[in-house]
Amino acid sequence: MFALLKIASCRCESLLGIAPMKRMLINATHAEEVRVALVTGQRLYDFDLENRTREQKKANIYKGHVTRVEPSLEAVFVEYGAGRQGFLSMREIANTYYKADPRQTTNIRELITEGTELLVQVEKEERGNKGAALSTYISLAGRYLVLMPNNPKGGGISRQISGTVREDLKNMLASLNTPRGMSVIVRTAGIGRSQEELQIDLQHLLDLWAQIQKTATLGPSPMLVHQEAGVVTRAIRDYLRDDVAEILIDNEQAFGEAYNFVKAVMPNQLDKLKTYTLNEPLFAHFGIESQIQTAYEREVKLPAGGSIVIDQTEALVSIDINSAKSTRGHDVEETALNTNLEAAEEIARQLRLRDIGGLVVIDFIDMTKERNQRMVEAKLREATQSDRARIQFGQLSRFGLMEMSRQRLRPSLEEATGYVCPRCHGTGMVRDLRSLSLSIMRKVEEIALRERHGEVQIEVPVEIAAFLLNEKRHSLVYLEQTSGVRVTVLPHPHLETPDVCSKYTRL
């Protein structure tokens, strides 16, 4: 079942003048954290991560019951099995759950009562002191379609599809055998697919919905009815396109999960699945660890010497552009334009890598010419065209500010791998213990597998040393045996995360 891979270094592609290949890289060598990267050649353009030490509920479906009706909020609170009750707005409640006709009364207490059982889907994860946002309008994502099984008015075509292609898909959508009371959305992956392929995908989703309904009858609320797919399956479902040449996976179990999904849903793509077997870590081989690291940093450097500074606040994300040492231009206006154009491209990339959602305000370097302002706006729109999230743009104001909003697809990278810093009382973020420890482990692996002899010494805070020497002891022993490099972990009582010291010695 497993395809063996002999990889010619991707660095050769650019040297030979070959167009860089698009690849999906799945790193699952550490069970605590599974990472998916999409690269063109050696440039990272999208990134997803699943922290398996934290439960993710988004898109899960639960059987819950109403615990409190709040007329002042026009909402109800639902017990669905999590630690905190979920928030369900009235506009997210399907008419089938109402006790009265909503056209005859606006009194929420007459429409729905405490104790009412309902199927809910998590729309937004819990954040801070806010409970999860729920909806009774279920959506099930397939390869080419999204099924809305209890929303007859929710169908249509992805907003990213336009022109004659949109009209063709509308006609094809109308001819699909969609049951009464349901609706279907065609995803961008549905472009160029036959009606037969779309119908097969629809049938798969209908079968899934039937199973969900059956499971919901098996027990009382609250209960989990349907678990959203893990990051491996989800990434292949959402990101695999015809232009992705291969999927490289460095773990046998993850490969098996991917193989089973692809075989069931898109068997014609099986030849793209390959196991990665080289000694060098997968992400290090493609040179993207340092690019991933930029997604954890406040300041990101631009090629010509400028930088962007990203700050998360309670209300919005602010992004500031600095020209710094940038020299791209003969005068101030040209330097500002060139730096802003570089920044626009990097901002679009960082929004995807960090999975930033909500309101974003960008402070571009001031430009006096309106033509240049329109160029920067156009560049940002162009750079975000491949983003799966819905994005809305404002125009550059006279103060050089540009507002935009980005759909929150899942918890941001910062939320998934960080925690509120106990030393700064929440004014900043640091990577959590496991994430930082695994980052150190990957760096040690990279050095050991490259050098093949000598010793790597790392001085780390006590809690990180405890994690490495207990949770990752077998990994360290295996690394020493396979690389011939001695790895010494030294706990330092005066170091605090994220500070570490490392030293390599040739013996």
Q: What are the functions of these language-model segments?
A:
Residues F2-L507:
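Single-stranded RNA-binding surfaces
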